[in-house]
């Protein structure tokens, strides 16, 4: 974890068995695409998200059927579950009763004070945090009239207004998001929010687009925010399989040294010197390491002359040549392997190193607990 780009003065907030904020690592979130009342389909999608590395998952709760399904879903998953609530406070109460781990609301659209108070009291009783979801596309009318259009200042004002509603009810387990589809607006809003309050910030670029365009847009916006040390949890919003959201989020955090539980692939861009099918090999290796929960660095390079030197930081790697490959660790050649088995040999080495890393991590954990 890179302390230089990590926001350490944020208030810690418990979400299930995790803590968001404080000096904890950023948490990856996603949201299901299923109808929440379809428990079987929702659980199946959540399990795929878990396997991909999702740490917190949100479900839409638009009606009573969805709210009533929360308890059954909770029994079958292993990561914290968040209920996305709009307008009807009774759905929030049912979700809390069903064992939800966090509620996402806008206090301003829940209704009169007694309704907000009912949700807050139920959340407080169960130790459940509330995320205030500010969105540039749904700011309050009086804020739009004041500023003329969605602005970062208007978004922060909206957040502070909602925060005050909860604080007036002596509720402080709050997480805030400041989402916008405009990248520059989102960056400015998160910067100003980070200065305005110390509650954990949930990062996201809303309505970012399809898999390709949305990945680029989210990486541009969230990368700029992360580089400033802002953010405690994030979701990459894509019009795609939500598993892809998790994959992009993991890669983004790895790029900033903010994920200590994910494998990294280093591969060269290819050129006319390459004698192997590097692209397909790189894709195969990337898929193989995608679910590893250790910070192993793996290199797949096409040039046996420059390859090992270009990936000195890799724990293990291969550099291809005609008919054979060089297997190397930390830039030092270990042995030559025939081309037809070099990927399998690389996978064996990956398994060995990953097991060593996992054992070392468990040993450190046991030492800390003593």
Swiss-Prot record:
Its cofactor is [4Fe-4S] cluster. It is an enzyme of class 1 (oxidoreductase). Pathway: Isoprenoid biosynthesis; isopentenyl diphosphate biosynthesis via DXP pathway; isopentenyl diphosphate from 1-deoxy-D-xylulose 5-phosphate: step 5/6. Belongs to the IspG family. Binds 1 [4Fe-4S] cluster. Signal peptide: none annotated. Keywords: 4Fe-4S, Iron, Iron-sulfur, Isoprene biosynthesis, Metal-binding, Oxidoreductase. Converts 2C-methyl-D-erythritol 2,4-cyclodiphosphate (ME-2,4cPP) into 1-hydroxy-2-methyl-2-(E)-butenyl 4-diphosphate. This is 4-hydroxy-3-methylbut-2-en-1-yl diphosphate synthase (flavodoxin). It catalyses: (2E)-4-hydroxy-3-methylbut-2-enyl diphosphate + oxidized [flavodoxin] + H2O + 2 H(+) = 2-C-methyl-D-erythritol 2,4-cyclic diphosphate + reduced [flavodoxin]. One of its GO terms (biological process) is isopentenyl diphosphate biosynthetic process, methylerythritol 4-phosphate pathway. The lineage of its organism: Bacteria, Bacillati, Bacillota, Bacilli, Bacillales. It comes from the Bacteria. Its EC number is 1.17.7.3. GO terms for molecular function: 4 iron, 4 sulfur cluster binding; 4-hydroxy-3-methylbut-2-en-1-yl diphosphate synthase activity (ferredoxin); 4-hydroxy-3-methylbut-2-enyl-diphosphate synthase activity (flavodoxin); iron ion binding.
